[in-house]
Amino acid sequence: LCTYSVDYEDNDRYFQKSLFQPNADSDYIGLMAEAIGSDHRNVVLNNVDVAEALVEATLARGVPGFTDVDSSLLLFCRQVHRDFKVCLSGECADEIFGGYPWYHRQEILFADTFPWSRSVDVRQSLLRPGLLPEGADYVQAAYRRTVADTEVLDTDSPLEKRMRQMFRLNTDWFMQTLLMRKDAMSMHSALEVRVPFCDWRLVEYAYNMPWALKSPEGREKGVLRKAFEGDWLPPEI
């Protein structure tokens, strides 16, 4: 089994914690590779190469996207393609098992809009004035339409109902964006990436799991961690 990870030059010096990444991945990659006995390869990128790939990544996607997040993925896929034509990737575990901070922080969870885009002002400021005068209204209408379309049970508590809505918001919007990004960058690199966490049976099952079961002790992706306790993976993972 061959596994890959990506890092950046001098990341050990300049890494800063954030809501999305409270710890550097490098702290756990070695533990994981050793536990599963994989032939692990770490791809190290630098800022110059990532910046120079911005235009190519945008053209590969066909629309403006995640800028350096796209170009770094493009370079990473290109490195993997040197050895393999097909690989597995872990996209969407955060969406269906509650790994993002907006599943756990009340002030974000109950915000009456998309949790990852609570304001469109900054994004809209990048566009020519008047190009999308109703941009904020469009975003809010899409949010309300998704929430209204979410199936809930009469017995759901307010928290359980909101978690179902959050699940739909993530799978219908955030997850789709990640999948389109992964598909565009990987196929541009002649690499086929498969995403087992997106199997419809797993997604359907996860949707129907009570939040207390999905997030035991309030842990991000708690049920997924529980599934691999014991002899499967190191306790740090």
Question: PLM features: residue spans?
Answer:
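Short, intrinsically disordered, charge-balanced linker/junction segments flanking boundaries
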Residues: 234-237
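ATP-dependent adenylate-handling active sites, centered on carboxylate activation for C-N bond formation
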Residues: 1-166, 173, 181-232
